[in-house]
Amino acid sequence: MLLIKNGTIVNPAKHQHEVTNILVEDGKIKEIGQNVSAAGKEVEEIDAKGLFVTPGLIDMHVHLREPGQEAKEDIYTGTQAAAAGGVTHVATMANTKPVIDNAAVLRDVKHRIAETGVVKVSVIGSISKDLEGKQLSEMGDMAADGAVAFSDDGHYVESANFMRRAMEYADQLGKMVIDHAEDMTMCGHGFMNEGKVSYAMGVTGRPATGENIAVARDLLLSELTGCHIHIAHVSSGKAVDLIREAKAKGVNCSTEVTAQHLYFTDEWLKHYEAAFKMAPPLRTNEDRKALIEGLKDGTIDAIMTDHAPHCNEEKDVPFNCAPNGIAGLETSLASTLTVLYHQEGFTIDKIVELMSVNPAKLLGIEGGVLTEGVPADITLIDPDKEWTVHGQDLYTKSLFTPYEGLTLKGKAVMTIVDGEIVMKEGKVLK
């Protein structure tokens, strides 16, 4: 039994923002209120004075790499990293080896999660067999076994007709399709955003137009099929405009942005550091500002990480040879608080909405709310705690982080999953 006292409860789903107490018993929230007590019972008291007490953060886009790529990350280390970052639930993508394109692989992954997961994990099935965009995956069987959505993330579904069929099928199953929207005929040979910085560096670029074309196509297909399309990791200001216009027309669409695209721009790549290499790439400061405006007006629904760790030796190579992707679970909240809360004036309520409430709604999973009777998935946040990021101190297997040596402001100081403290003051306890 836990009694969280004197914390500021931030519970946007219930329009609640007040200093109060939470009693947790048998893995669930038993009571919330000023006069809550556990008289006569053995209870661990947590003094949360000066802290925000929020629904557990939910990251709807991570790559845990298991099975098949455990040298990069595995379910245990990836969920340890999640706990360290205040995340109580993640959704893992299908680009494992073998690909999660059938119910047998999905069940195997869920078994592994049950054995070693530190936080909760939902599984996203692939759209196509082996991520090749040619044959539909076993979407119906995977939906029956608990797949929360479908995505070939890391790969763009090139054929519009194939994507149409996939969306029609997913819509029948009541599932969302998540697309990595970059037209690879334009972007496939690029290493960073195409623009002034890439020209000065002499590096082949990935034009934002490639993203815009893909986003426009996906929105049109959603309008045609009625299927919920979720645009992964939007990075282009023009793409945000397209999504805003589609939402105004009633198209069934949503989108997300990574914390790193809100913090960094392509200017950070001037020293050819592979830690900043990702897809879609970091874009201009104008794009970054457009992403922030998209969050302000509700065009962008969620903040996530696209946690995509690689082996250290894979990243410690010349820039053009390094794979795309960074580890982000342990820095996402702090990066977001630094930029949005401390610099842009976002309320903590809005940030919790973007990092917990909305991801739960989009994935159709429990979470995003603090109320009596629900699982006690809770994050305690110190918004003013300053800390310096060092890759060697992180729980993820990937030591390369674009935040290396940077001081961020704000940090999760406790993570509770089903009433159990899994992280306290930066130390993961499982």
Can you name each region flagged by the protein language model?
Residues 54, 103-120, 168-179, 331, ...:
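Alpha-helix-loop-beta-strand connector modules within alpha/beta enzyme cores
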Residues 49-113:
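Metal-associated gating/positioning segment near the N- to mid-region
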Residues 7, 22, 27, 50, ...:
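Divalent metal-coordination and catalytic microenvironments
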Residues 60-73, 122-135, 204-208:
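Active-site mouth loops of central-metabolism enzymes
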Residues 200-228, 275, 296, 301-303, ...:
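His/Asp/Glu-enriched, well-ordered alpha-helical/loop segment
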Residues 1-55:
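Histidine-rich, glycine-flanked metal-binding segment
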